[in-house]
């Protein structure tokens, strides 16, 4: 569909719980191979390690988990393919925390990250006004993208009240907060029978289908 995750722009990927958002983000970070700063507030370090080794090795996660439990050195070679990723596992990072981590990254590595992953938006947004906090956070993350030149890749939720039809992904209108004005690219995710469906529901630079009824399907 001519989709590009662009530097200096905000990209949002939304889906219901267990739809595969984190797996999609991790695969993106691994396969692009660019300098990445990954804020993983929603998933523990152990789980991310298992997922990453499974993706790189092609071995199932249950097998990887058992092998790591038996031998903590198992999979060390796989981490050679992850050297371009730096992690932050703070469970509730603030916008100031994110700014500080980006500044520290630039100081240590001599350049800003090219990809910044935020997993996920709700864990960063705070305040009594949830929807207002989501909008404010997106505004600040868009500014961060412009300031650093990084592609800022943010995971978000859709309402669980939305019924995802077979063969479709969630619609743009089902995204929590319903405000998608700031991102250049918005994708929604679903999964069916071992396949991941990714729909482009907003695309400032190309085609999209806000209904989510035109997903592309991938094995995962």
Stretches found by the model and what they are:
Residues 32, 109, 147-148:
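Helix C-cap/helix->beta junction micro-motif
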Residues 36-129:
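Conserved inter-motif catalytic segment of the P-loop NTP-binding fold
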Residues 14, 26-29, 49, 53, ...:
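Generic hydrophobic alpha-helical scaffold/packing signal
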Residues 1-7, 78-82, 144, 208-214:
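Core recognition of P-loop NTPase motor domains used across DNA-transaction enzymes
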Residues 20-21, 44-48, 95, 123-127, ...:
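Flexible loop/turn segments at secondary-structure boundaries
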Residues 1-59, 179:
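The Walker A/P-loop phosphate-binding site
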Residues 18, 136-220:
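Phosphate-binding/switch region of NTP-binding enzymes
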Residues 11-13, 37-39, 88, 153, ...:
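Hydrophobic/aromatic beta-strand patches that form the interior of the parallel beta-sheet core
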